[in-house]
Curated annotation (Swiss-Prot):
PROSITE patterns: MALIC_ENZYMES. Homotetramer. Its EC number is 1.1.1.40. This is NADP-dependent malic enzyme, chloroplastic. Its cofactor is Mg(2+); Mn(2+).
Amino acid sequence: MMSLNSSSVVKSSISGVSWTQSQSVRLSVRRPMVVAMVNSNGRPERSVGVSVDGAVKDVNAPVAVEVADSESKKPTAVVGGGVEDVYGEDSATEDHFITPWSVSVASGYSLLRDPHHNKGLAFTEKERDAHYLRGLLPPVVVNHDLQVKKMMHNIRQYEVPLQRYQAMMDLQERNERLFYKLLIENIEELLPIVYTPTVGEACQKYGTIFKNPQGLYISLKDKGKVLEILKNWPQKKIQVIVVTDGERILGLGDLGCQGMGIPVGKLSLYTALGGIRPSACLPITIDVGTNNEKMLNDEFYIGLRQRRASGKEYAELMNEFMSAVKQNYGEKVLIQFEDFANHNAFDLLEKYRTTHLVFNDDIQGTASVVLAGLISALKLVGGSLADHKFLFLGAGEAGTGIAELIALEISKQTNAPLEETRKKIWLVDSKGLIVRSRLDSLQHFKKPWAHDHEPVNKFLDAVKAIKPTVLIGSSGAGQTFTKEVVEAMSSFNEKPIILALSNPTSQSECTAEQAYTWSEGRTIFASGSPFAPVEYNGKVYVSGQSNNAYIFPGFGLGLIISGAIRVHDEMLLAASEALAEQVTQEHFDNGLIYPPFTNIRKISAHIAAKVAAKAYELGLASRLPQPENLVAYAESCMYSPKYRNYR
């Protein structure tokens, strides 16, 4: 084997292979495969040996992040959202060189099919010669920005959102860095494509459009082998797992194994919006069957063809999964439960919140983003949270989670007992207003919201009886905020706050146009899915989107950069307050209670800083010492999709 340099010799006799390098190399042995080493002429040399996890770095390249404040402490965490930057991808600038040795690069043909390192037509002339790419690409060399421009042009040619979704997923499988650069720079246009509402349709048709597997699938057939399956995943330094069992996908119900589109979409946002490196993210679907007859009878369905398991069988598989994750990835891996049905969502969160770093976005993430919107809305309507009365349509994960966080915030502001602050919040479920006379028949998570009141069966009657100042929909039932409901809200509120949170768009309690029209332009409105601006009486109203994507990427980043070992409710309150602080007077003047997504990475950095600060304050952070400038530190830890130069 030819050496890179005659100085600073590093040798290995593993599998009969030896090499030399002029600079430090990180080494780890994997199974034998064909790799390419660089000879003295600068060209890769084909050889059969072991894969080398290493990068020839600039000797001056920083290993740890130093925040902007020159007076601040130097944190011990390496860059990239707290994940070791083995290849120098985040600490390197475009002028530094990296060597893509994590996979086989014995041929240029293979390199072009590796989404983690492929640059397409952006490979330079030198790289084409060095990595056997000459002739495998057209002669033109284009830059990253032109590639983004071309891809956006191509995507906009599709009129059907699902086709745009498929184009984005194809790009992710082909060129990871181009995918994330495209998404980051066009987030407002592409967010509804890679996530709600389009991802819902993608999950419904996942078996039909399925091409390449993404993430891990763990089924009942794998009981006793979960740890082995986790070890099959090629990336070993996982920091965030998003897991679903597919039972309650958005407002679409039980989609079984085809719910995988949700973890995949969520984790793409962890990277694009929160800066967590893609290699540190792992989407997982737990397949315990489905009760959806349409799926079971679909010849293209990709999951187990059996009725959904429950009880002991379900609990044992989930317990094995949680134990295996902790054993394989350690104490500080974040496990986000996603789209579990109510009965499992609450039980899993309660069971594992004291033993694992767990987060339920449907319960906690939704609550945090809604609370942020309410804090912002108070600047438009006046008063404090304690001055308002809240009525929810929907008493599931989202509804009760939001209600509890509102009650916690009021308790924090007023020093009143939580039992008292809950009395300002009323919930309606499928059987009507939740009152004390129904206590014996209520599910355990609804019981704290059973107040003294006569039974009310119809939602409109509940609105008229309670006379709330804030109306929140989390029912998953479309068109339930009727004209009569909105008019009733407008009759006893000068500026009624109406939040129609259910996803996707078809399940929204009302549209933006309906809310503004029926309230005669007086409502403060936000929704879970995006709506176009509305013109009413010569004025244009731009509604806000109460999207969990405001919260969970920054929240996760905050947990990682602090090395948090548990999630505490005060961290959720801190995230809400941080998001509300990002709404400016200009946004208020336009009727917005959430900031635009165009600046989402800076918003996420501020949220991460607040969450990390709270983790340090509560003694739940393990990454020491604490950086003095947490915002700058969070920004410096974020993954960049810029191309790296290859030797």
